[in-house]
Amino acid sequence: MYENVFVIDHPLIQHKISLIRDENTGSKEFRELVGEIAMLMAYEVTRDLPLEEIEVKTPIAVAKTKVIAGKKLGIIPILRAGLVMADGMLKLIPTAKVGHIGIYRDPETLKPVEYYCKLPSDIAERDLIVVDPMLATGGSASAAIHFLKERGAQSIKLVNLIAAPEGIKAVHKDHPEVPIYVASIDQGLNEHGYIVPGLGDAGDRLFGTK
């Protein structure tokens, strides 16, 4: 359906997506579920990591085994909703470095503005995973990827729980080489820019704000 877009349809992920869509799911359970889904998605997102063979001594004999080789990983949550996804992924890849990008839309120009950015100093040497629960218009995600490229990033993946077709098209128009990993592609956006059926405002539901 879309090039360079991967829908992760594992039964556990799809079950948990159903739970976070439910308006009756409270903030505590919502946070836990988002972290769990992100951790499960990380398994697929990192499937193409290169391996190298090493030898280790077991209590019985020397074994030839494999470890991750090549570039190190970096997780970049888009503030604020991406934070919980980053925490979930860190449970699976605890050695990854974490950077943060904060973006808002200028009300007059409607262009994304970076208000916060703290990144590992060696991002050019890392495979970066940008995380944000929702890919709606694609403006924030595309801007975040642009800002990372400006700072030397060479390898970037985007991971979202739920995406709208409009967001996917916008990101791939600006960054066609960036793969997008999602748990669901929904119908589209409503007049307020929310994904339909979506799950509402992920940030508000994660942190109990309105």
Curated annotation (Swiss-Prot):
It catalyses: UMP + diphosphate = 5-phospho-alpha-D-ribose 1-diphosphate + uracil. NCBIfam families: PRK00129.1, upp. One of its GO terms (biological process) is uracil salvage. Catalyzes the conversion of uracil and 5-phospho-alpha-D-ribose 1-diphosphate (PRPP) to UMP and diphosphate. It holds the Pfam family UPRTase. Allosterically activated by GTP. Pathway: Pyrimidine metabolism; UMP biosynthesis via salvage pathway; UMP from uracil: step 1/1. It comes from the Bacteria. Its EC number is 2.4.2.9. Binds 1 Mg(2+) ion per subunit. The magnesium is bound as Mg-PRPP. Uracil binds at residues 195, 200-202. One of its GO terms (molecular function) is GTP binding. Its cofactor is Mg(2+). This is Uracil phosphoribosyltransferase. It comes from Caldanaerobacter subterraneus subsp. tengcongensis (strain DSM 15242 / JCM 11007 / NBRC 100824 / MB4) (Thermoanaerobacter tengcongensis). 5-phospho-alpha-D-ribose 1-diphosphate binds at residues 80, 105, 132-140, 201.
